[in-house]
């Protein structure tokens, strides 16, 4: 049976410093993300009919997952899908402004890049407990949203363009309880070229 595996990061653990510190990145990737994968593989044991499905397919079609393992797949499959996506939209050469059609769409939808950042930051800062803030494409339109725990926008039929993990494990070593500071630091490492590519694929 095919196993889900931890993807390699496209940069070193210290590449996003000082914004995202080396120790947090290492623990986040090798411990937290890896645990979701271990638990997902355990949940899928004995379910050969799900073996060939990508994690994105699993979380996008939870109603097709047997009820006995649906919650485990939602939580751990969501954790795997969300983190796999997250690593790809971060870059040591990130920051700056959105590019291409995404830049135009953000301007049209939110009025300005600053207004978008404010709405995204609010989604992340006001998410009670653990969860994620997202910029998604929903029915062809950009939308800022948040999800609880490891729920994926894919489950709601939405396609992520950028996302930010606001679980404490993502920032506590460096930012303690200062979640807004962590959200502010995120803008220095967003890979807008990757986000533009995601937008092109989603719209």
Swiss-Prot record:
Q: Which GO terms describe its molecular function?
A: metal ion binding; superoxide dismutase activity
Keyword terms of this UniProt record: Manganese, Metal-binding, Oxidoreductase
EC number from the UniProt entry: 1.15.1.1
Which GO cellular component terms, listed alphabetically, does the Swiss-Prot or TrEMBL entry include? cytoplasm
Q: Cofactor comment in the record?
A: Binds 1 Mn(2+) ion per subunit.
Q: Which InterPro entries match?
A: Mn/Fe_SOD (IPR001189), Mn/Fe_SOD_BS (IPR019833), Mn/Fe_SOD_C (IPR019832), Mn/Fe_SOD_N (IPR019831), Mn/Fe_SOD_N_sf (IPR036324), SOD_C_sf (IPR036314)
The source's superkingdom equals: Bacteria
Tell me the Pfam families matching this sequence.
Sod_Fe_C (PF02777), Sod_Fe_N (PF00081)
Q: Which cofactor does it need?
A: Mn(2+)
* Reactions accelerated catalytically: 2 superoxide + 2 H(+) = H2O2 + O2
Q: Where does Mn(2+) bind?
A: 28, 83, 165, 169
Report quaternary structure and partners: Homodimer.
Q: What does this protein do?
A: Destroys superoxide anion radicals which are normally produced within the cells and which are toxic to biological systems.
* Family, similarity comment: Belongs to the iron/manganese superoxide dismutase family.
- Name of protein: Superoxide dismutase [Mn] 1
């Amino acid at each position: 049976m095919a196993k889900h595996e931890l993807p390699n990061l496209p940069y070193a653990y210290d590449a996003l410093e000082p914004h995202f510190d080396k120790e947090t990145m290492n623990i986040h990737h090798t411990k937290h993300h890896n645990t979701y994968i271990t638990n997902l593989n355990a949940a899928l044991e004995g379910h050969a009919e799900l073996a060939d499905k990508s994690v994105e397919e699993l979380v996008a079609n939870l109603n097709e997952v047997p009820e006995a393992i649906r919650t485990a797949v939602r939580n751990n499959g969501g954790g795997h899908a969300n983190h796999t996506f997250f690593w790809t939209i971060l870059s040591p050469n990130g920051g700056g402004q959105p590019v291409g059609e995404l830049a135009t769409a953000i301007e049209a939808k939110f009025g300005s890049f600053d207004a978008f950042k404010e709405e995204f930051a609010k989604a992340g800062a006001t998410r009670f407990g653990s969860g994620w803030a997202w910029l998604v494409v929903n029915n062809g339109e950009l939308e800022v949203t948040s999800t609880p725990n490891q729920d994926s926008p894919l489950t709601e039929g939405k396609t992520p363009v950028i996302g930010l993990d606001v679980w404490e494990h993502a920032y506590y070593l460096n930012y303690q309880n200062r979640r807004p500071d962590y959200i502010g630091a995120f803008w220095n490492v967003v890979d807008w070229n990757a986000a533009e590519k995601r937008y092109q694929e989603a719209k």
